[in-house]
Amino acid sequence: MKNLERLFAEKLLKIKAIKLQPANPFTWASGWKSPFYCDNRKTLSYPSLRNFVKIEITRLILERFGQVDAIAGVATGAIPQGALVADALNLPFVYVRSTPKDHGLENLIEGELRPGMKVVVVEDLISTGGSSLKAVEAIRRDGCEVIGMVAAYTYGFPVAEEAFKNAKVPLVTLTNYEAVLDVALRTGYIEEEDIATLNDWRKDPAHWDAGK
């Protein structure tokens, strides 16, 4: 496990951006029941942590993707960090809506991209990957090349891994499910007996039953 993954997991747990409640699960917007909730947007309220995320995403982009022409943030969670990263790299920035706005030019992509541009997408969190990959499709329809995506966190669901593989989008993240559980267990945030419940949920989150 990489040092960055552990370090960022520690920071997220410290500010309570991640909540683990196997006995009292959350309900996601999708309707899924989940013992795990991650709100990366809380990092924006902590200047040193906000800067850490910007620096590390910027570093990953430079290391993994080389020549980049523009940064795209996925609305709404990744707009702030995407803009900060674009500023650090001195690159154009756009953001991609989940649906076109219902007035004006009805844009899906806000900002300006030119055909042929190499774009890296910034995302705050990967669950199923559906909304993230819709943003990729929108950028590709504009004639640009999406050379990769960097996200703050991924649950690592099999459905998401398969979706990114099929879409041919390399994905890099600051931290992930395994790192969070490792840190949470070592620091007493969760108990050993919670691990089986959390792992059962991650295998099939759509059908997970908290009572089993």
From Swiss-Prot:
Q: Which reaction does it catalyse?
A: orotidine 5'-phosphate + diphosphate = orotate + 5-phospho-alpha-D-ribose 1-diphosphate
**EC number(s) from the headed UniProt entry:** 2.4.2.10
Q: Does the keyword Glycosyltransferase apply?
A: yes
Q: Which InterPro entries match?
A: OPRT, Or_phspho_trans_dom, PRibTrfase_dom, PRTase-like
Give the matching PROSITE patterns: PUR_PYR_PR_TRANSFER (PS00103)
Q: Does the keyword Transferase apply?
A: yes
**Which positions in this protein are listed as binding 5-phospho-alpha-D-ribose 1-diphosphate?**
97, 101, 103, 123-131
Keywords on record: Glycosyltransferase, Magnesium, Pyrimidine biosynthesis, Transferase
At the top of the EC hierarchy, this enzyme's class is transferase
Gene Ontology biological process terms in this record? 'de novo' UMP biosynthetic process; pyrimidine nucleobase biosynthetic process; UMP biosynthetic process
Pathway(s) annotated for this protein in UniProt: Pyrimidine metabolism; UMP biosynthesis via de novo pathway; UMP from orotate: step 1/2
For orotate, which residues are the binding ones?
127
Task: Describe, as the record does, how this protein assembles with itself and its partners.
Answer: Homodimer.
Descriptive protein name: Orotate phosphoribosyltransferase
Origin organism of this chain?
Answer: Bacteroides thetaiotaomicron (strain ATCC 29148 / DSM 2079 / JCM 5827 / CCUG 10774 / NCTC 10582 / VPI-5482 / E50)
Quote the gene name from the UniProt entry. pyrE
